[in-house]
Amino acid sequence: QYPDIKYLDRPTEGQLEQMLSVTLSTLSEYPDLDAVHAPSDSPARGIATALQQRGRWKKVGEDGHVIFVNIDGEPIALKWIQEGYMDACISQDPIAYGEIAVEMIVKHALKGEAVPIGAYENPKYFWEKGEIVEGATGPTLIIPAFVIDGENAGDPRHWGAVAEKDWGIPYT
């Protein structure tokens, strides 16, 4: 679909050290690399280290910046986005997943009631609105995918901010 984009598949098995090694070798092979993606924030630390070691750790908009996106929304990703080094992250919200599961159990399942199908709203979460649908194994909450970027990375409702600031869980 995009003939001018060359996609490089470089498996790292989600391992930080492999991510670092593979990114360093890829930057050697392709010194003008334009973009990188990691399937999770934790191993993405290897990408950040490789970019730093090769002098490519540049802020968004700076000459030589490598577009950097990944998935999760951990505290480190929020930090990198707020500092301007990472472009964006697609968030997964494990805090909401757990809290909403408990909420549905307490409000409905423990009372022998069915979980209501339809709209779900809670302004406590950044995404605010979802939908409960009939799933293969029971009610399933569909939460819209959302992008964390420079415009919204400071929102205190992101799970990475809650885990770090409200719960005191340091990023390691």
Task: Identify the residue ranges that each predicted region occupies.
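Hinge/beta->alpha junction and helix N-cap segments in small-molecule ligand-binding domains
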Residues: Q1-V22, H37-G46, D72-E74, Q92-Y97
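Alpha-helix termini
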Residues: Q1-Y2, Y30, R54-G61, A114-V115
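Short hydrophobic/charged patches on amphipathic alpha-helices used for structural packing
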Residues: T23-L24, L78
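Glycine-rich phosphate-binding loop signature in dinucleotide/nucleotide-binding domains
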Residues: T26-L33
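Venus flytrap/periplasmic-binding-protein-like
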Residues: H37-D87
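Extracellular/periplasmic ligand-binding modules, especially the Venus flytrap/periplasmic-binding
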Residues: P39-L51, I81-Q82, A88-V115
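Hinge/cleft segment of the Venus flytrap/periplasmic-binding protein
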Residues: I100-T172
